[in-house]
Amino acid sequence: MRFYKIISFMLLGLDDTDSPDGMCTTYLGALIANELKRRGFTVTNHRLVRLNPNVIWKTRGNAGISLEISGGDSTVVFEIACEFVERFARFECEKTNPGVVVVESPPDPAFYYQALQRFCTIEETVKRLERIGALYKGYKNGRGLIGALAAVSSVLPDKTYECLAYRKNEVLGTPRIYAEEGFFTSEEQTAPHTWDTVDFIRREIVCVPHGKDPVLYGIRGDTPKWAIKATGFLETEEPAFSQIWETNQGTDAHLLPLPDGGPIEGESYRFSGVVESLPITNRGGHVQFTILSNGMEIPVFAFEPTKYFRNAVRELVVGDEITICGSFQKGVLHLEKFRPNLLATQKSRSSPRCPICGGRMTSAGKDKGYKCRECSGKVRDVPDQERTLQTKWYEVPPGSRRHLAKPAVRMKDDI
């Protein structure tokens, strides 16, 4: 006879079950949650945890999930989770290496922060799992154990929510059916409490994926109430079901202060400095400048996929004091957003208008100011050029934003 222990609290972690060609770890997690409820367990929280976006071996968005569960035996939960992983995970993909973890108390959050802001190895993850007495199983090389342990170790001082709607099995792999206008109406009616639903400037839908995964759409918001309200304006194919996930998305949780020794490959930072070189546009449309911070010169790039964001970057001039956020990869900082703190004075590059007759003036000679050909009026000083940048956050378009990056609508108090 088998005896079961009724546990009042446990956490299930899951990661790395998807692939670029299909499946989604949140979908599999939701299926497991539904099965657990069917078997009499109580699932009190569904959490989606984004990790270091610079990890090169991620399948897609580098996220793990955790479920908070009570009312049954942890061994049964573990067996159900493994059964679903073995049935649904995309093992044929080289990068798909699932991991399942069950613990009966929250592990030290230090591991979560390491996976979020730096890097973890499979070996150190397994050692931690052994040390805390977790139930765990890694498939193939077991890399998914990192995200699974990070998810159950996570703490969210700042949190957001995402309502994910999933497609029916019979339509998977076919084009998604939806009315575009409903998404624009949804954002108009619920912003700034929701974000990244659409890009109004480019007239693009952002929250609908284009791949073969089972997600129909994902609406992100400050609270479950706002995320659910936003879905009421949508006209889409009928989803199989929806699930609200508590997340660290849109929180800037991945950002670190700049180390004294300089930026480290694969880490993300927020820091202030002074623009050292005028932005230039490279071949391919990438905009580059240099920032000086703590005596270090750091190359900064706004890459072509950030589209109209580059226009704001081009307005920077030498001497501007700014705060920037971004990831350091391959020796350059990938700019996510910036805020001017103090704009430098810049002399106008064009000849001024005559203050008497309004005509265009010409140079009167080196250090002699300008003179008017029409009325002989003179001005001594070159006027300052009007700056268009404001003291506010400038950010990449919604379609280019990383999952963890905090949108400007959530930074109104960050001035």
Swiss-Prot record:
GO BP: tRNA wobble cytosine modification
Cellular component, GO annotation: cytoplasm
Domain of life (superkingdom): Archaea
Catalytic activity: cytidine(34) in tRNA(Ile2) + agmatine + ATP + H2O = 2-agmatinylcytidine(34) in tRNA(Ile2) + AMP + 2 phosphate + 2 H(+)
GO molecular function, one term: ligase activity, forming carbon-nitrogen bonds
Protein location: Cytoplasm
Residues in coiled coil: none
Keywords: ATP-binding, Cytoplasm, Ligase, Nucleotide-binding, tRNA processing
UniProt keyword Disulfide bond, yes or no: no
EC number annotated for this UniProt entry: 6.3.4.22
Entry's family note: Belongs to the TiaS family.
Reported function: ATP-dependent agmatine transferase that catalyzes the formation of 2-agmatinylcytidine (agm2C) at the wobble position (C34) of tRNA(Ile2), converting the codon specificity from AUG to AUA.
UniProt-recorded name of the protein: tRNA(Ile2) 2-agmatinylcytidine synthetase TiaS
Organism: Methanocorpusculum labreanum (strain ATCC 43576 / DSM 4855 / Z)
